[in-house]
Amino acid sequence: MKKKLSELPLRSGVGIVVLNKQNKVFVARRIDNPKNFWQMPQGGVDEGENFLNAAYRELEEETSIKKVELIQELEGTITYELPDRLLGIIWKGKYRGQKQKWFLMRFNGEDNEINIKTKNPEFLDWKWIEIDQLTEVVVDFKLHVYKEVKEQVKKIIN
């Protein structure tokens, strides 16, 4: 018997807030979304992998960024669920959403070291934005995640 989509488990994931020297936030526009939505690097945690190692791995896989230092692990975990239109499509239908652990990191490299044309590219474009712009550029079902992340980051950097 097939599981109901609403009974699917949450995927264990990480998200990374990358700040440059001017405290601007790295965001990238996804290949698979035709609208002008941007997101911070994020992804799943592999079996046997801890959250921090997953964050470093995902960041490098998606952006080629290696020169970062951990500023702080954000408090708690933040969960989002996929809207009905994406249930059963994203992640090969295995999950209904993600439960994410977020990390704040400082990028110590140069912009020309960032490369989104990776082995398995996820992004079309990238840019640095002000922290307050985060909630203006994100897809609707992740808005509450970005609001929470933004508030935590602002407390740390201000």
Task: Cite the ranges covered by each PLM segment.
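Acidic, metal-coordinating catalytic segment for phosphate/diphosphate chemistry
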Residues: M1-L19, K92-G93
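Short loop/turn segments immediately following the C-termini of beta-strands
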Residues: R30
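A conserved beta-turn-beta hairpin within the catalytic core of GNAT-like acetyltransferases
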Residues: N33-N36
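A short gly/proline-enriched turn/hairpin at secondary-structure junctions
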Residues: Q39-M40
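Unchanged
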Residues: D46-D140
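Charged phosphate-binding loop/patch that engages nucleotide di/tri-phosphates or the phosphate backbone
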Residues: T135-N158
